[in-house]
Swiss-Prot record:
Residues 73-167 form the CS domain. GO terms for biological process: heart development. It holds the Pfam family CS. May be involved in calcium-dependent ubiquitination and subsequent proteasomal degradation of target proteins. Probably serves as a molecular bridge in ubiquitin E3 complexes. Participates in the ubiquitin-mediated degradation of beta-catenin (CTNNB1). It comes from Macaca fascicularis. This is Calcyclin-binding protein. PANTHER family: CALCYCLIN-BINDING PROTEIN (PTHR13164:SF3), CALICYLIN BINDING PROTEIN (PTHR13164). One of its GO terms (molecular function) is S100 protein binding. The modification N-acetylalanine is found at residue 2. It comes from the Eukaryota. The gene is CACYBP. Coiled coil: none annotated. Residues 2-80 are annotated as: Interaction with SIAH1. Component of some large E3 complex at least composed of UBE2D1, SIAH1, CACYBP/SIP, SKP1, APC and TBL1X. Interacts directly with SIAH1, SIAH2 and SKP1. Interacts with protein of the S100 family S100A1, S100A6, S100B, S100P and S100A12 in a calcium-dependent manner. Residues 73-228 are annotated as: Interaction with SKP1.
Length: 228
């Protein structure tokens, strides 16, 4: 749901709260108000995160660490995409193409891979990715070393399947961020369902209260009075 539509829903709830007098109605509207405010906050955080990711992509991916012999740097910056047959992970490491071939090692399992780059500018670099979203073919997976880049090729066990995420953990985190109601429906449907349930379950006084608050809020909006 677009942020603008969420803001309109929030304003509508605030108008109804001003008019409602029944405790049950106010409690339901207050709960709906909190849900909408939380979703607006999540939308803003997602926008900020996307901006931060765009800025990170413009920076060198190699992690900078003090030059200490034997020190291992954990790789956290990478990019990935996919084809019908492979999931491809790109790791940028300055000068990696100049180290001996045997210094770049990748170990694959059906649901993970482990990259270790030894002795690159006095440090080692490690990247471990567990719980891949789907199984891969260990025998069909490989790595390539290009200029300043390590390319890891994970062969999909089932070809022509799409990976929406790289790992199962990432998928679960994204699904937890989804709102509890269907965001593909009409923007006001969540609020309307709450009011409809209260109306259907309420007595005559409650129905009159909701009807009065609804009519007055509509009249107020029609006149352009949007003070909240």
């Amino acid at each position: 749901m677009a942020s603008e539509e969420l803001q309109k829903d929030l304003e509508e709830v605030k108008v109804l709260l001003e008019k409602a007098t029944r405790k049950r109605v106010r409690d339901a509207l207050t709960a709906e108000k909190s849900k909408i405010e939380t979703e607006i906050k999540n939308k803003m955080q997602q926008k900020s995160q996307k901006k931060a990711e765009l800025l990170d992509n413009e920076k060198p991916a190699a992690v900078v660490a003090p030059i200490t012999t034997g020190y291992t740097v954990k790789i956290s910056n990478y990019g990935w995409d996919q084809s019908d047959k492979f999931v491809k992970i790109y790791i940028t490491l300055s000068g990696v193409h100049q180290v001996p071939t045997e210094n770049v090692q990748v170990h694959f399992t059906e649901r993970s891979f482990d990259l270790l780059v030894k002795n690159l500018n006095g440090k080692s670099y490690s990247m471990i990715v567990n719980n891949l979203l789907k199984p891969i073919s260990v025998e069909g997976s490989s790595k390539k070393v290009k200029t300043d880049t390590v390319l890891i090729l994970c062969r999909k066990k089932v070809e022509n399947t799409r990976w929406d995420y790289l790992t199962q953990v990432e998928k679960e985190c994204k699904e937890k961020e989804k709102p509890s109601y269907d965001t593909e429906t009409d923007p006001s449907e969540g609020l309307m369902n709450v009011l409809k349930k209260i109306y259907e379950d309420g007595d005559d006084d409650m129905k009159r209260t909701i009807n009065k608050a609804w009519v007055e809020s509509r009249e107020k909006q029609a006149k352009g009075d949007t003070e909240f």
